[in-house]
């Protein structure tokens, strides 16, 4: 009994690995995450061109965007049981996730439940291209060089944690949340980034709607997020 978890990358279907495409094409059942009932799955939209929908069943699993850990754990158990029940029928099963399964992924919650309750299932994890690697390629930039350090901030609401990370790293990757853009820019100034430090901001990396802008830090002070209210990724380099 085998389950393949596939990292679908940032958005461009052509960035899926050869192994990922092979598993998707052979799948009898595909599971894909979404935040609420009726909302399209991003991971599914990336992989759809490789799915034979006439022979493959597709199940959307709900991962609500809430902070109540108890409620979340209940949903994780439900989702993992749905997957396990199907795997135990002997079908070729695939779980899709955006980016890479090891990085801020819904897969990690499923994986923990399966290891604890269904350790008879053989799990295969196929890596995907993280959004910030696709971002760096599109921007034709280096994230870090030599002995430089790199920090990743998954969301920007904990400003103290951001301050600690920024103070100790040469390059910072900010993911997902642009509501605190002004505060983040000020923290960069406070923690050693110069007026000429390079800031690159992107939305919708690797798809047709992609927006990518590079500016000096001094040009972003007292301005709104140049890529809009929400940014997918912002990279700040201290020394360029």
Language-model-derived ranges and their functions:
Residues 1-13, 18-20, 25-122, 212, ...:
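Class I S-adenosyl-L-methionine
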Residues 3, 166-240:
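A contiguous loop/helix-start segment that scaffolds small-molecule binding in enzyme catalytic cores
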Residues 71-80, 139-141, 165-168, 212-220:
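Short, surface-exposed amphipathic charged segments that create phosphate/polyanion-binding patches used
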Residues 102-168:
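Class I SAM-dependent methyltransferase SAM-binding "motif I" and its flanking Rossmann-like core
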Residues 22-23, 87, 95, 142-146, ...:
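Solvent-exposed alpha-helices and their adjacent loops that cap or buttress functional pockets
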Residues 32, 60, 95-97, 125-128, ...:
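General beta-strand structural signal in soluble alpha/beta enzymes
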Residues 76-85, 142-154, 218-232:
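A polyampholytic, Gly/Pro-enriched intrinsically disordered region
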Residues 37-40, 130-133, 181-182, 207-209:
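Short gly/pro/ser/thr-enriched loop/turn and capping motifs at secondary-structure boundaries
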């Amino acid at each position: 009994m085998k389950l393949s978890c596939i990292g679908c990358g940032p958005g461009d279907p052509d960035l899926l690995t050869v192994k990922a495409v092979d598993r998707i094409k052979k799948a009898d059942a595909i599971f894909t995450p979404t935040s609420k009932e009726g909302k399209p799955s991003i991971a599914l939209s990336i992989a759809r061109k490789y799915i034979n929908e006439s022979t493959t069943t597709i199940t959307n699993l709900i991962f609500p965007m809430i902070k109540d850990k108890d409620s979340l754990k209940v949903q994780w158990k439900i989702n993992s049981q749905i997957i396990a029940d199907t795997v135990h029928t002997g079908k070729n099963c695939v779980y899709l996730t955006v980016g890479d399964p090891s990085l801020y992924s819904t897969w990690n919650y499923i994986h923990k439940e399966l290891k604890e309750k269904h350790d008879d299932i053989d799990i295969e994890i196929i890596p995907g291209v993280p959004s910030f690697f696709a971002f760096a390629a599109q921007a034709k930039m280096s994230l870090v060089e030599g002995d430089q350090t790199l920090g990743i901030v998954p969301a920007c609401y904990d400003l103290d944690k951001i301050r600690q990370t920024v103070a100790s790293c040469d390059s910072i990757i900010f993911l997902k949340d642009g509501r605190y853009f002004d505060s983040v820019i000020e923290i960069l100034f406070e923690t050693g980034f110069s007026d000429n430090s390079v800031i690159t901001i992107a939305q919708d990396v690797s798809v047709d709607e992609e927006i990518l802008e590079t500016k000096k830090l001094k040009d972003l002070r007292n301005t709104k997020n140049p890529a809009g209210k929400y940014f997918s990724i912002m990279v700040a380099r201290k020394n360029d």
